[in-house]
A protein has these predicted regions:
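Conserved glycine-rich cofactor-binding loop
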Residues: 11-12
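Substrate-binding pocket helix/loop in short-chain dehydrogenase/reductase
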Residues: 93-95, 101-106
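Conserved glycine-rich Rossmann-like NAD(P)H-binding loop of the short-chain dehydrogenase/reductase
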Residues: 25-41
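The beta1-alpha1 cofactor-binding region of Rossmann-like NAD(H)/NADP(H)-dependent oxidoreductases
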Residues: 36-37, 58-69, 99
């Protein structure tokens, strides 16, 4: 049976590499990130290289409505592996960083990650199993 893998933060860095690895393994992919153009380019790359079937679901995970929309769209879908990878960091002195950008970071790195984790945990319990990997790393941003 072909496994379905949902990857958030799939358009770059660690998420893109997860997509490439799972595509090489013959998995069906659901790719989520903010930039639809990058997701489309990645889906084309993976289809050309491996014949991978990719579903593209662009979303801004800082927006609760986008998180809710993703959950609604995927409610009936069997997802075997969930890579909860979306995230970013704001660097600099607390006195100098933009408070709105920091709030956006908390929404993506904490609130959305928790919301999607809970959604997938319930889905996987209902379907009889699955795998969730929560990724929290700044390694993809460092030289």
């Amino acid at each position: 049976m072909t496994k379905t893998v949902w990857i958030t933060g799939a358009s770059s860095g660690i998420g893109r590499e997860f997509a490439r690895r799972y595509a090489a393994m013959g998995c069906r992919l659901i790719l989520t990130a903010r930039r639809a153009d990058r997701l489309t380019a990645l889906a084309e790359e993976l289809n050309d290289a491996h014949g991978t079937v990719c579903r593209i679901l662009p979303a801004d995970l800082a927006d609760r409505a986008d998180c809710d929309r993703l959950c609604a769209e995927l409610a009936g879908e069997r997802i075997d592996i969930f890579i909860n990878n979306a995230g970013f960091g704001v660097c600099g002195s607390l006195l100098e960083t933009d408070p709105a950008k920091e709030e956006e970071m908390v929404q993506v790195n904490v609130a959305a990650m928790r919301r999607l984790f809970q959604f997938m945990l319930r889905r996987m319990q209902a379907q009889g199993g699955g795998t969730i990997l929560n990724v929290a790393s700044s390694a993809g941003l460092l030289p």
